[in-house]
Amino acid sequence: MARTTICALATPPGRGGVAVIRVSGPAVPAIARALAGRLPEPRRAVLARFCDAGGDTLDEGLMLYFPAPRSFTGEDVLELQGHGGEVVVDRLLRRLHALGAHPARPGEFSERAFLNGRMDLTQAEAIADLIAADSEASAQAALRSLEGAFGDAVRELVARVTRLRVQVEAAIDFSDEEIDFLADEAVAGQIGALIDQLQALRDKAGQGRVLRDGMQVVLAGPPNAGKSSLLNALTEDDSAIVTEVPGTTRDLLREHLHIDGMPLHVIDTAGLRDDPDRIEAEGIRRARAAMAEADRVLLIQDIREPPIDPAALALPGDIPLTRVYNKVDLSDEAPGPRRAGDEVAIAVSALTGVGLPALRDHLKSVMGYGEAGSHFSARRRHLDALARAADHLALARRALVEEMAGEIAAEELRLVQHNLGEITGEFTSEDLLGEIFSSFCIGK
């Protein structure tokens, strides 16, 4: 528990009806008595005069006291609810500083809550995600993380990994039993179930990252396929210049939109073709770089042309792809979704709008629309940690099932635990904590 006491304005600065100032730390009882002449009963709002050192009133408002450990930070917390004027707030903060409370750093209240065991790191990050949410779906996902859905799923997986690791290490200690244990089909079953559980968690976290950050979709295809027209149709705005001249789009054009509350970042790119001029070649290079970072690529082509081989355009093979056949109004084909094997395709007309509702429904579906209530908020660092854990779990499986190498398997399982623990903050560094909490608001 911290030895210093901190304070900060918890509401937005400026003029308003009410300003909330938060104080946390061991000096809270003394500060309350010096400021208002008394320490309120825990969790009861009382009307109080907030006075300066000479006894003159600085403001009048409500005061609440939350004793440790049952407070947001796990420390003694005092909350002052006064009038929302800049001068009033400034005078109160200067009085608190004089009484020994230091100005809080951004996110320091949440950091103390984490360090004092009031929440794990996913819950602390969810506070910032909830504040920054720009859609109902992302707000709901952040709330589920704040309630512990993500952290609980990680801890359940860690518990199962730990049990298997204990079994492996016990077998190593009794070398005459090690081979029999490692050869047991039940061990292969356990590690297989762990791999499946981890993959399911990665899938959910990936959806959660999309809900938090938005899905990045790149419009790709040959020149004059209608990429810019489709961007304008999706955004319902003339964002992109559209002409009949091939190669009109030379640079990336980014637009942000919501489809029924689901955040989407759409990037229009230069047409992909051989023998471009020097400027167009740079546009194509940027298009390929954008595709490599995308969550999904929409491969757009004229429906009257033969289906394009993605490999012929050197599209990234590891990025999910949806085919969009444009200009259906110029053909005898029916608009809407179609499927060839595992491939999803949708016929549309960016000009007339037919087929666009089906495309929007498809984008909503791949973003997890309708399932948002079961998702939690996730960040890129979470996905990276889960990927590292999956790599080590695969190595542990090989050591256990194929190589009968118990000591190697035990070490790989330890690394799985460590990487999962980085998500919840069980294993972390001061640099990581500083990076996370520095992005928070002051007063949070």
UniProtKB/Swiss-Prot annotation:
Its EC number is 3.6.-.-. Its cofactor is K(+). Mg(2+) binds at S228, T249. Its main location: cytoplasm. This is tRNA modification GTPase MnmE. Exhibits a very high intrinsic GTPase hydrolysis rate. Involved in the addition of a carboxymethylaminomethyl (cmnm) group at the wobble position (U34) of certain tRNAs, forming tRNA-cmnm(5)s(2)U34. It is found in: Cytoplasm. One of its GO terms (biological process) is tRNA wobble uridine modification. One of its GO terms (cellular component) is cytosol. Homodimer. Heterotetramer of two MnmE and two MnmG subunits. NCBIfam families: mnmE_trmE_thdF (TIGR00450), PRK05291.1-3 (NF003661), small_GTP (TIGR00231). K(+) binds at N224, T243, V245, T248. Belongs to the TRAFAC class TrmE-Era-EngA-EngB-Septin-like GTPase superfamily. TrmE GTPase family. (6S)-5-formyl-5,6,7,8-tetrahydrofolate binds at R22, E79, R118, K444. The gene is mnmE. Binds 1 potassium ion per subunit. Residues 214-368 form the TrmE-type G domain. PROSITE patterns: G_TRME. Pfam families: MMR_HSR1, MnmE_helical, TrmE_N. Keywords: Cytoplasm, GTP-binding, Hydrolase, Magnesium, Metal-binding, Nucleotide-binding, Potassium, tRNA processing. It comes from the Bacteria. GO terms for molecular function: GTP binding; GTPase activity; metal ion binding. GTP binds at residues 224-229, 243-249, 268-271.
